[in-house]
Amino acid sequence: MLVWVLYKIDPRKVWTYAEHANGWLLFVTVVLATLTFPVRTIRWRLILRDAKGERFPITPLWHATTIGFMANNLLPARAGEVARAYVASGQLPVRFTTALGSIAVERVFDALVMLALMAVAIAAPSFPAHAQVGGRSLSTIAASTAVLFGAFLLVALLIANRPTPWLVLVERIARRVLPVRAADRVLHASDGIVEGLAVLKSPARFAGVVFWSLVLWITNAAAFAICFRAFGLAVPLEAALLLQGIIGFGVALPSTPSFLGIFEAATLVTLQLYGVESSLAVSYALTYHLTTFLPITLLGLWSLTRRHIRLRELSTAAKAGTV
């Protein structure tokens, strides 16, 4: 993917644009992008609870969050999601599957909030008329995706509030088609997932997750918007809402470490919709990616040392997909 992004791009132009970017605004960009991780931790603390419904201490959740996103940057196939659940289950009295289920809940909220913010950008007068991605109207893609994730949320709400029929159905299917040990593992995982969905049963916690999701993605969009100004891009600020949405869905599937190439391609496609020259768009993408990559990666490596965990251990856990 990175090869496609760099095809026919003049590397000297890319370097020149990066060299002339406003350093102070880049610094603000990095600070804002890094602030999203404490916000993620606060939100996760609302979602993930112990067996009695009590909150966990924030420090272990912070370490699990930084390690997880560091793993996404250094390991392939979105290993950070599994690594984050693995670290949480090793530091707190919570099952791996419950932690992983809570992260799945996060992802649904992320998708719905990003789509809502994308809708703001698409509805703005500055949005390029008849913009398409892959030959399809961007508004059509966003609407279809919103329906899909809305359906996911509806199913999750049903399971959270009436878990017994779901668990009975899973048990029947697992016992019929799987060996005993494999079926037991599936049932154990199902119990953990249901526990991870418990936040959906509490209106107060649900509202809190929505609030912190909005804070998270507005802060993230602000980082993109400040970086627009650092590079002198003549694009409206609401383009940042569209950009983060396209990047977010672009990196949703397992890919290369740090989503290298996917991130740049999504940025290039989005900025081209607003008439940004290719070399400038690529320079923006590479600079943003590199500068925001470093802080969370270093924080994650520091958390590894604090929790006495080796990177190889995370890689093994990610490949196993369970603990």
Where are these regions (language model features)?
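Helix-boundary and loop/linker segments of multi-pass membrane transporters
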Residues: 14-22, 54-58, 92, 195-203, ...
